[in-house]
């Protein structure tokens, strides 16, 4: 069991199943079980995934001043997250609408409200940092002070870059330069994947880079073992909704990497973990325990054969 501090964006999500992306205009569409509303966002999804895997998690985020925190722990879910460090200090909780179709294409509409103006109370964070094994951050403004805490306490820092864009790269340099592990999603990157990973590795010198590629799998770079490898996605369930798959993959990778220091084994486990996740509606559903994941692994593969 590892101890994580996870800080970043949490939002309320409305997920809508549509016939195809891009959508065609129709004045009315009625379809049963096609709209799902829940809590989501990088920090929430990653915290929940790590908790399912058996880790200790300090979940740190900001929400609207009138938000009902019970939305983070619905009664029918076995695993709960502490909301002790969920601070209601912004006017409204960020919102997202996600449209998706059967081909795994998706279209997002995001409204981060006034989260860019939030200031997290770091006095709550400081006593917890020495006890954690890793800090996991979103590249949002209120997470910037967390970087120095990780560096000063010699803690591993993992950062999921939310919607990477070249014209915004300069604003993310403090995250990029200090992270031991970086995660990008290719849905906002219009560059040759291997060249992008190579450039990020040379420019920022992280230990690990993961480039999530959706239905095409992932590319992983490991500085210490000197390789850059593509892994295909794993298909174990019918795809219901691929939203949150990147969060699931990232969290599971971090869980196993801290445990084993083996990036190949960790990405292998993470791809399997994500494949189960996308068989469920909602970004925060479909997670497995470590025991369940190992059982799936033994049924599907010989783990040594994946290295």
What are these regions (language model features)?
Residues 62-64:
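Alpha-helical transmembrane segments within multi-pass membrane transporters and channels
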Residues 1-60, 69-70, 281, 307:
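Glycine-rich phosphate/adenosyl-contacting loop at the front of the ribokinase-like
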Residues 4, 197-307:
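Conserved phosphate-binding/catalytic region of the ribokinase-like
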Residues 53, 91-94:
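Short, basic and Ser/Thr-rich N-terminal targeting/leader segments
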Residues 2-12, 75-87, 99-229, 261, ...:
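Ribokinase/PfkB-type carbohydrate-kinase core domain
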Residues 34-41, 92, 240, 244, ...:
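Residues at secondary-structure transition points
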């Amino acid at each position: 069991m590892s101890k994580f501090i996870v800080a970043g964006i949490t939002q309320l999500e409305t997920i809508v199943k549509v016939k195809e992306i891009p959508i065609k205009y129709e004045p009315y569409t009625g379809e049963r079980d096609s709209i799902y509303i829940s809590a989501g966002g990088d920090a929430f999804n990653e915290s929940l995934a790590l908790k399912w895997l058996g880790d200790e998690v300090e979940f740190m985020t900001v929400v609207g001043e009138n938000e009902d925190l019970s939305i983070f722990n619905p009664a029918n879910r076995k695993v709960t997250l502490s909301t002790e460090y969920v601070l209601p200090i912004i006017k409204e909780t960020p919102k997202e609408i996600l449209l998706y179709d059967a081909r795994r294409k998706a279209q997002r509409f995001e409204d981060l409200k006034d989260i860019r103006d939030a200031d997290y109370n770091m006095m709550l964070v400081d006593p917890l940092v020495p006890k954690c094994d890793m800090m996991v951050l979103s590249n949002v403004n209120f997470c910037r002070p967390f970087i120095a805490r990780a560096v000063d306490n010699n803690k591993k820092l993992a950062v999921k870059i939310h919607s990477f864009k070249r014209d915004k790269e300069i604003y993310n340099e403090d995250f990029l330069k200090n992270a031991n592990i970086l995660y990008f999603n290719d849905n906002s990157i219009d560059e040759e994947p291997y060249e992008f990973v190579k450039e990020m590795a040379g420019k920022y010198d992280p230990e690990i880079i993961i480039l999530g590629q959706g239905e095409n799998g992932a590319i992983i770079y490991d500085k210490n073992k000197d390789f850059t490898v593509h892994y295909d996605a794993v298909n174990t369930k019918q795809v219901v909704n691929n939203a949150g798959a990147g969060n699931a993959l990232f969290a599971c990778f971090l869980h196993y990497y801290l445990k084993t220091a083996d990036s190949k084994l960790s990405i292998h486990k993470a791809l399997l973990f994500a494949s189960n996740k996308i068989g469920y509606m909602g970004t925060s559903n479909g997670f497995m325990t470590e025991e369940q994941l190992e059982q799936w692994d033994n049924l599907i593969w010989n783990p040594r054969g994946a290295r």
